Amino acid sequence: ADPAARASVSAVWGVDPDDLPGPGVPAVELLQSAGLPGGVRALLVHGSNVFVSAPNVQTVREALGRLDLLVVSDFFLSETAEAADIVLPVLQWAEEEGTMTNLEGRVLRRRRAVEAPAGARSELWIMA
């Protein structure tokens, strides 16, 4: 890790640079450690259906099955959400106001097109 970057971040947050976490691990390693001693015990899957999109899906299913807690935030009951201990319903793009940046780098305003179902929350609300 870059010491200058760590010093900058620690100054902004008012913490000792040594208290900042180190580099993370690749997603494949993270999933392989799920539910094992010293590994991840709980996981929030956000915006992904890993039971369909991850390589070696059977291994991923087994790994997530070892977790103490699996939380999935999604706007429909995906294969991954079906296996979750908790499913947090999120808004679809047409159900929220905001902005987006397209592939050209243009910032576009998005207006709500339809009302969201009761109980659904924005992903920002869930993360906060």
Language model segments and positions:
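Non-catalytic alpha/beta scaffold blocks inside enzyme catalytic domains
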Residues: 1-128
